[in-house]
Amino acid sequence: MRLSVALISSFQWKKRSSKAIMRRGRKRRRRRQRGEDFFVAPEIPLDLLIEILTRLPHKSLMRFKCVSKQWSSLIRSRFFSNRYLTVASPLRPHRLYISLVDHKCDSREVCHSPRESVLLSFSSPSSFDQDLTTMQGMGGLHMVTLRGLILYIVCGKACLYNPTTRQSVTLPAIKFNIFVQGNEHSLLYFLGHDPVLDQYKVVCTFVSSSSQDLETIISEHWVFVLEVGGSWKRIEFDQPHTPTRSGLCIGGVIYYLAFTSMFQDIVVTFDVRSEEFNIIQAPLVLSAYVDSLDFIEYGGKPAIFYHTSLKENGLVDLWVLENAGNWSRTVLSLQPCQLHLVDNDIPLTLVDTTQNGEVVLVPSDLCSPFYILYYDIQKNHLRKVEIQAMPDHKKDGIKGIPDFGFKLMDKSESIIHLET
């Protein structure tokens, strides 16, 4: 009897379980049949997605590459990298870079001795303590910034660093043809961008001169295209010269100051796309040997900012290179009430210009407190910003009192992937 009751109970339980399973199956089928009535979120249009992503911080973009292959391909594409550069965002303040080097080995010289360096980055002098980023082994005395990239020299080799992605690339060494034992040798690298073909190129000028007769100068020039499989290519140019500045690139043309074997001051131009050099006569009153001048961008044109008289009488000469290759001169006179902002004891070095047209000047020596001068050419206004806490170079791994280089990256965050 008990066995019969147990069998009946087991049968009823299985029956109820079967009915429950059937009911759940019917519900699933009904759900599948009504699936077309469910709300399906539409995909975000590509143009809207790009607009959203270009306004995000670079750290978010690096994480979002893991969302899908489509997002990864989009973020890594050259189109998106260029779009990201052009979008102005309040989340991207300009950044200041100070490079400390452990000894006075001029990075323009051909040397092979190891050295230590550290690159310090902060968004503004007021946030130096809170927003200081330290990058060991990066930077140099002669740095070039362009479209979010930093070019510097380490023992004769050109190095590129993207502070946004933290990617660094060291270009191969060049086998120069004019290396003469016993001569003085120097080299300088330039960074250019061709907006038509969207190509980045590094230009190297190597100079060999007699140590006894500096009037005898021979030079050779090399170009490296930043692309997969890139290599150094020699460019012929029959005008030997010695560069004295790192120059700047405007509209696909690199401009830099130099002098010839006859100690004639010239301006050298290099067309990034055609890879052709040209020479323009510099203003006769200027000298390439003077430290108190350099190229700036003024109104979309290259201009020489000559500030040798800024400390004494508050005067600045601005020489603008016009389309016809002629120079136009403007004399700027600082307001008398602002002359006290300039320290007469320490020479000033021109760093760069901001997107607002302010010329950035810094002392040529590490002083305490260290300060930055912002000179607004349009308003003829000078302001001084002090950095209360300069970095402790001993704490940062730099022994002794280092030399330093200073550069400005004005709201340019590049997510381009460097390939060579």
Curated annotation (Swiss-Prot):
Residues 38-87 form the F-box domain. Gene3D superfamilies: 1.20.1280.50. InterPro entries: F-box-assoc_dom_typ3, F-box-assoc_interact_dom, F-box-like_dom_sf, F-box_dom. Coiled coil: none annotated. CDD domains: F-box_AtFBW1-like (cd22157). This is F-box protein At5g62510. It comes from Arabidopsis thaliana (Mouse-ear cress).
